[in-house]
A protein has these predicted regions:
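Hydrophobic core register within WD40 beta-propeller blades
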Residues: 6-8, 45
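Blade-loop segments of beta-propeller domains
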Residues: 39-42
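Structural recognition of the beta-propeller blade-terminating site
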Residues: 26-27, 67
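Residue-level detector of Asp-centered blade-edge/turn motifs that repeat once per structural unit
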Residues: 10-11, 49-50
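Eukaryotic protein-protein interaction scaffolds centered on beta-propeller repeats
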Residues: 1-4, 21, 33, 60-140
Length: 140
């Protein structure tokens, strides 16, 4: 396991590491508490001062907030390099976005090795999944 970044809990009882393909939490003795997979190398990890959340940023620029207690991903956030567009989404698909930010994500569905995958932009499902209020409450 090659560690890219580390963060220490405020009470020094445990720490979090970012690696290629995961964020992991260990106790003071070095025993694993949880392992949360990622789709990319984790470049940075931070623990909130109240030890409630872990923030990670991966090599693609996607930020993820995880629950400190179990590593569950609560919210994803992608700010585009143009500084104007962004999108935030939950693992269940609810999202909020800046104007034109909906174009940044969608669902990629594989259809087998001999067929091209399908891509469904998130905006196709706006009426069901665009829920700014749900996204805003996630980190409360």
């Amino acid at each position: 396991m090659e560690v890219e970044s580390t963060a220490l809990a405020s009470d020094d009882s445990s720490f979090v590491v970012g690696t290629a393909w995961s964020v992991r939490r260990f106790d003071r003795q070095g025993d694993s508490r949880w392992n949360s997979e990622s789709e990319s190398t984790i470049a940075e990890v931070l623990i909130t001062p109240d030890d409630r959340l872990v923030l990670s940023v991966d090599s693609r620029g996607v930020a993820q907030w995880r629950r400190f207690s179990d590593g569950e991903v609560l919210l994803n956030f992608f700010p585009h390099v143009d500084g104007k567009r962004w999108v935030a989404w939950t693992p269940s698909g609810y999202y909020d976005a800046s104007p034109d930010g909906e174009a940044l994500i969608g669902w990629h569905i594989n259809r087998g090795a001999s067929r091209a995958p399908d891509f469904f932009p998130i905006e196709m499902f706006r009426d069901h999944f665009r829920r700014p209020g749900v996204v805003a409450r996630i980190l409360d």
